[in-house]
C-alpha cells in the first residue's frame, strides 16, 4: 500500500544535493530509500545535469535498500541500479560505495543499533550523508500500517561529535523540532 511508504523531511533536500554535487560520487547507496527521493534527485543532478539523459549513458551506480515490503514501485526499478528489501542492520554490502545517504533512518532503531549501523556505513562508504531528528518531540509509534516508521531512539548532535564531520547543518521544523544533517567521512 503506497500510504505506508517512508519519506524524509523537506529540510534535507537542498543540503544533500549540494553535498552530492561537491563529492561527485560514482556510486551511492540509498539507505531506507522510501519513495526514492534520493535516487531520483541524484539521477537528476549527477546525470541529467551532466547531459547523460539516456539510462544506458548513466555513469553513477545508485543502489537502494529498504526494510518495508510496500516500498517498491516501477519508479525504483527505473531509477536504481539495484534495490534490496533488507534491514540495514543485517545487510552485508557486496561492494564499497562513495556515498551512503541515510536520512531519517537511524531514529527508527534503538540507539545501539543506530550507532552500529552508522559504523557499518562508515566502514563501507567514503562519505555518509546523515539526516536525523534531534532532541525531544519526535517520539511516535509506527503509522499508516508501517511499524518501521516508529521513532525508537532520541538523537542529539553531541552523539555525532566523535565522528569525522566535514559539514553539517542544524535546523528546525516549522513546529520547532530540531533536525541535523551531517557529512561524515568514512
Q: What is the predicted function of each stretch?
A:
Residues 125-135:
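Conserved beta-strand signature within the Rossmann-like core of class I S-adenosyl-L-methionine
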Residues 79-81, 106, 128-129:
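Conserved short hydrophobic patches within well-ordered secondary structure
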Residues 101-111:
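A short SAM/SAH-binding and catalytic strip from SAM-dependent methyltransferases
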Residues 137-142:
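A short acidic, helix-capping loop that chelates divalent metal ions and anchors anionic groups
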Residues 1-99, 112-119, 123, 145-186:
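Conserved N-terminal segment of class I S-adenosyl-L-methionine
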Residues 36, 105, 133:
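Flexible loop residues that form catalytic
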Amino acid at each position: 500500500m503506497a500510504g505506508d511508504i517512508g519519506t524524509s523531511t523537506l529540510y534535507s533536500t537542498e543540503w544533500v544535493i549540494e553535498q552530492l554535487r561537491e563529492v561527485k560520487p560514482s556510486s551511492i547507496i540509498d539507505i531506507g530509500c522510501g519513495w526514492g527521493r534520493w535516487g531520483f534527485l541524484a539521477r537528476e543532478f549527477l546525470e541529467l545535469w551532466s547531459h547523460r539523459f539516456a539510462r544506458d549513458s548513466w555513469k553513477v551506480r545508485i543502489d537502494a535498500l529498504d526494510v518495508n515490503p510496500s516500498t517498491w514501485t516501477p519508479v525504483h526499478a527505473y531509477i536504481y541500479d539495484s534495490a534490496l528489501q533488507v534491514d540495514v542492520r543485517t545487510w552485508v554490502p557486496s561492494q564499497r560505495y562513495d556515498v551512503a545517504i541515510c536520512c531519517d533512518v537511524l531514529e527508527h532503531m534503538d540507539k545501539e543499533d543506530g550507532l552500529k549501523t552508522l559504523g557499518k556505513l562508515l566502514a563501507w562508504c567514503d562519505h555518509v550523508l546523515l539526516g536525523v531528528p534531534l532532541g525531544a518531540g519526535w517520539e511516535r509509534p509506527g503509522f499508516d500500517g508501517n511499524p518501521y516508521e516508529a521513532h525508537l531512539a532520541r538523537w542529539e548532535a553531541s552523539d555525532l561529535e566523535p565522528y569525522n564531520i566535514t559539514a553539517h547543518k542544524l535546523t528546525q521544523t516549522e513546529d520547532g523540532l530540531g533536525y541535523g544533517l551531517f557529512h561524515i567521512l568514512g
